[in-house]
């Protein structure tokens, strides 16, 4: 480097040595090196140490381990007939994006190759503000009632007594909440261990609302990998976890550095509100998928990741996504799990990053932001709107408002009238097991996939107590009795009844 930077303190004062400390001399005794105490006035050293003590911020309670990159989204087909979002209004239009991939249950230092759903969150820096599409690599989820989420996540993490993963906790919760079966079958197929973040799809899971002046539609979005979908066996994933727990993080980084830019095609399924009412399941049920034959995929775009973050902490670790970050033309649906995420995600960002997390560069909208009441707070660093009045409607600060896009009065809209009630979505019916049964049939179309599901479940549940194992066999039998029987046979082969188990 021809002109290297000058080493300074955090306040810009140049210093002569990064590694010296100020101490009292020891020349009056036989030892010639300084032996006296350090001096409190040594700002360079104490400032460095104090900052080091505060380097870590709270990790995400879920999705703690992740990787991310910047890219570009391009509109490929006109879908203005179903969505008025401006970033979609012209074929060929491009929008900058940032995508973060992650595992869900593991801590920040856990393995990328663990059997786990993958987070797939993308921030679109549009001319109407930031749009966050906070998806997963599975089209369904474990729950449909948001009150269960904290309980569920606790059972997938560590036992509060041993601080170890616990097969009893894991399967105890799931078998008591059988609406989880669809996601569990997906997770314990080889799809639960993708080889690479580049080689997996992304799904909205939730239903959303897309709308324009003509009406509104219920939508479900799919990101289909142009690299194909490639998965590992249970043994391959376990081996890679031990040899290279950061493999998928580095795989994404290296591919982009080498110019092998990963890309995904973007599709949407839509139905009208009237069609939604006629389905044999609620479109607000996160444990269900929409049949493609009835609601075909419609192509609308493509995005490519082509730029690595310059600093992992500043950009990937501090990236803050939320499904409440929307733009005109797109809204959350009444899916109760989605509704709960609208609050929970920004709330955890305020906890992890501070109330002004949207001022962090990776989270900052590309367009001008004017919300005069959002002022002050920890780490307010954007000028705080100067002397502008800190309330809307001030006599000396006129503003303009954008008129909402209203659907035609002829278009049916959701209307509600009734009393407040306490409701838990705990009822389970036969349709909750129909789609898991169909998924088993889909696995049967590819050699070895059904066997892999049975093998993967048996490997995991063998560590549980026998009464829990029996519940697991019955749980999978709800989708197809064959599945429960096959799992039972393999578990008993691995862990014969009556054999002693050292659980610790």
Swiss-Prot record:
Main location: other
Any one GO BP annotation for this protein: response to hydrogen peroxide
UniProt xrefs under InterPro entries: Catalase, Catalase_AS, Catalase_clade1/3, Catalase_core, Catalase_haem_BS, Catalase_immune_responsive, Catalase_sf
Subcellular location(s) of the protein: Peroxisome matrix
Intervals of motif Microbody targeting signal: 502-504
Reactions the enzyme catalyzes: 2 H2O2 = O2 + 2 H2O
Pfam family, one: Catalase-rel
Cellular component terms (Gene Ontology): mitochondrion; peroxisomal matrix
Catalytic residues as annotated in Swiss-Prot or TrEMBL: 63, 136
E.C. code: 1.11.1.6
SUPFAM superfamilies recorded: Heme-dependent catalase-like
Binding residue positions for heme: 345
This protein's UniProt keywords: Heme, Hydrogen peroxide, Iron, Metal-binding, Oxidoreductase, Peroxidase, Peroxisome
Keyword Ubl conjugation: no
Cofactor: heme
A single MF term (Gene Ontology): metal ion binding
Function statement: Catalyzes the degradation of hydrogen peroxide (H(2)O(2)) generated by peroxisomal oxidases to water and oxygen, thereby protecting cells from the toxic effects of hydrogen peroxide.
Family, similarity comment: Belongs to the catalase family.
Protein name per the record: Peroxisomal catalase
Organism (species): Candida boidinii (Yeast)
